[in-house]
């Protein structure tokens, strides 16, 4: 993961703190999509530091990134009486939503949860077929509708079916939509409202899948979605060698939305709960002594 950032950082760690290093760090952070605020703060701290070794530089950057994630809302723990727990998955076209829904179902099933997968993407028959195949492979319950049907009604039926059949988790996959399409964005509000009618407090989690390769372009998408429905957290998809990593920290600092999961690869197992320490270990190369 993050080969771009790791390779550049390795070169940076071999330099003493100087004007050239600060300029290189500034360029790197901008290239890696950390944005103006974080980049300027990094450079300011580099200028103030007295010690010029690789470990100091790494520690300085690590502290800054940790600080950017401070004060984020934590996911309220669901009461043991709340069953099923409903997770609504939304995002733009091509962000890997349906595959992520399957990975999330696998994640919960590995933790002894019974999962109902609900496919509401009535605009794309292939999307519903894909979700059905995943559900069959995973042994999940499955509810879908007819092409062109009412997505909110399907969500309602899915939750009601899960309640009747005793499922502990419901994952609702929605159709991909661009953040600039007003009517499709309004549909999300309707789905959220109808979920609450099917089960009080639902949806308990609203996750947005974010294509990590989009970089800064993802920030405005997340902001618009968050304005329409309150996002509980983000699931970054396609986190591989081409992903730069900085967008996650920008969104956390600017929009106060936490990252909940990281998705990489095509396997159902390729979804991890976001762990900051593990993430930073993968983000940074091993520090060599100067």
Curated annotation (Swiss-Prot):
Task: State a single Pfam family of this protein.
Answer: SRP54_N
The role this protein plays is:
Involved in targeting and insertion of nascent membrane proteins into the cytoplasmic membrane. Acts as a receptor for the complex formed by the signal recognition particle (SRP) and the ribosome-nascent chain (RNC).
Annotated residues for binding of GTP: 91-98, 173-177, 237-240
Catalyzes what?
Answer: GTP + H2O = GDP + phosphate + H(+)
> What's an example GO cellular component term for this entry?
cytoplasm
Question: What's the family?
Answer: Belongs to the GTP-binding SRP family. FtsY subfamily.
In short, the EC number is 3.6.5.4
- Establish whether keyword Repeat is in the entry: no
Biological process (GO) annotations? SRP-dependent cotranslational protein targeting to membrane
Q: Where in the cell is it found?
A: Cell inner membrane; Cytoplasm
Name of the protein this chain belongs to? Signal recognition particle receptor FtsY
- What is the gene called? ftsY
């Amino acid at each position: 993961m993050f080969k771009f950032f790791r390779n550049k950082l390795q070169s940076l760690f071999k330099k003493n703190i100087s004007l050239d290093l600060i300029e290189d760090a500034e360029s790197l952070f901008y290239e890696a999509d950390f944005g103006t605020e974080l980049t300027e703060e990094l450079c300011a701290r580099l200028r103030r530091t007295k010690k010029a070794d690789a470990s100091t530089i790494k520690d300085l950057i690590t502290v800054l990134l940790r600080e950017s994630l401070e004060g984020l809302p934590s996911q309220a723990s669901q009461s043991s009486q709340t069953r099923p727990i409903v997770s609504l998955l939304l995002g733009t076209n091509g962000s890997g939503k349906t595959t992520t829904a399957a990975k999330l179902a696998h994640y919960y099933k590995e933790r002894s949860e019974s999962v109902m997968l609900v496919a509401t993407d009535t605009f794309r028959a292939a999307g519903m077929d894909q979700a059905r195949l995943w559900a069959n492979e995973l042994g999940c319950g499955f509810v879908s509708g007819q092409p062109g049907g009412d997505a909110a009604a399907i969500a309602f039926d899915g939750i009601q079916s899960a309640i009747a059949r005793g499922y502990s988790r419901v994952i609702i996959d929605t159709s991909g939509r661009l953040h600039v399409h007003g009517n499709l964005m309004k549909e999300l509000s309707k789905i959220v409202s109808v979920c609450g009618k099917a089960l009080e407090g639902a949806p308990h989690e609203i996750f947005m899948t974010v294509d990590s390769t989009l970089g800064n372009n993802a920030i405005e998408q997340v902001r618009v979605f968050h304005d329409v429905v309150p996002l509980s957290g983000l699931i970054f998809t396609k986190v591989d060698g081409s992903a730069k990593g900085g967008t996650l920290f920008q969104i956390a600092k600017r929009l106060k939305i936490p990252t909940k999961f990281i998705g990489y690869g095509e396997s159902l197992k390729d979804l991890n709960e976001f762990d900051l320490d593990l993430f930073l270990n993968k983000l940074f190369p091993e520090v060599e002594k100067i």
